[in-house]
């Protein structure tokens, strides 16, 4: 099973130095709203537009890593901000000193990540041909993100080949991050079926 998200990180990873349940109170000892204002000031016009409606919080799910990359973060919604305290409310329970990075929802990044995930899946399959697959794609993808229907299923067929492919659109997809399974949003999750080897 594999998952593809659709976010591109902005800024640098930071530590959540103060949290209260789902409230992000400080990032590297700075108010998160201050950090976001700085990121906004440094952003391109395109990213400034995305930050107004497509900003998320990425939560690193493996502690103690020295570097984090695409697929290492659990992506969660920003559900509010308090201008007075500078805190941000996140749709997740937060942990002290958890690594956090802000990502933006972006169609190009999503398509690129999907190609990379499918490429890794193709390599993992080796010479064995799957019997079929399931695709569970978020309702926030498809035509609304890419401007066309069937993007993810077409990418799957292009990379893995013609095989029975079923599934449906979801509002929450199950897939791995950092070796643990989570319910995601805005992702496509694939499950591939093939015979068990007799060896």
List each model region and its residues.
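Small-residue-enriched flexible segments
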Residues: 1-133, 138-146, 150-163, 168-199
């Amino acid at each position: 099973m594999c998952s593809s998200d659709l976010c591109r990180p902005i800024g640098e990873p930071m530590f959540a130095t103060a949290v209260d349940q789902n409230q992000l109170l400080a990032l590297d000892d700075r108010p998160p709203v201050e950090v976001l204002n700085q990121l906004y000031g440094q952003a391109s016009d395109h990213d400034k537009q995305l930050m107004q409606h497509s900003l998320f919080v990425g939560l690193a799910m493996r502690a103690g890593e020295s570097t984090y990359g695409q697929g290492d973060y659990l992506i969660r919604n920003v559900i509010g901000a308090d201008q007075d305290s500078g805190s941000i409310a996140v749709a997740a329970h937060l942990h002290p000193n958890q690594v956090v990075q802000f990502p933006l929802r972006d169609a190009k990044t999503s398509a690129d990540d999907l190609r990379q995930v499918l490429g890794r899946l193709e390599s993992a399959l080796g010479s064995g041909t799957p019997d079929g697959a399931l695709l569970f794609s978020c309702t926030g993808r498809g035509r609304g993100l890419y401007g066309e229907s069937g993007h993810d299923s077409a990418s799957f067929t292009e990379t893995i080949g013609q095989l029975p492919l079923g599934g449906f659109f979801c509002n929450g997809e199950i897939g791995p991050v950092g070796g643990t399974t989570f319910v995601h949003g805005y992702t496509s999750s694939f499950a591939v079926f093939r015979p068990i080897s007799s060896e």
